Amino acid sequence: MDIDASSFFQEGDEGQPIEALQSLLGLYGYDVLVSGVFDEKTRHAVEAFQRHFRPTKVDGIADAQTIATLHGLLKQLKSISS
């Protein structure tokens, strides 16, 4: 599940990158349906993630910083569980 951390995604976007984002959020424990559509539930999950890890900018847009933080946290979890 690779997603380009230089892109950004927001409500209304669709496609494989959104599926990857939803999968990553799900791996981190957020209740998101992997549909490939950046819907309201996905936006709420992104906002919740941002609220926890980047409280200075909670906008529901999966930007480069949000995606990089999510990748980094999942890498840490993977190395801890290995």
Residue ranges with predicted function:
Residues 1-82:
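Cell-envelope/ECM-targeting effectors and their regulatory/trafficking segments
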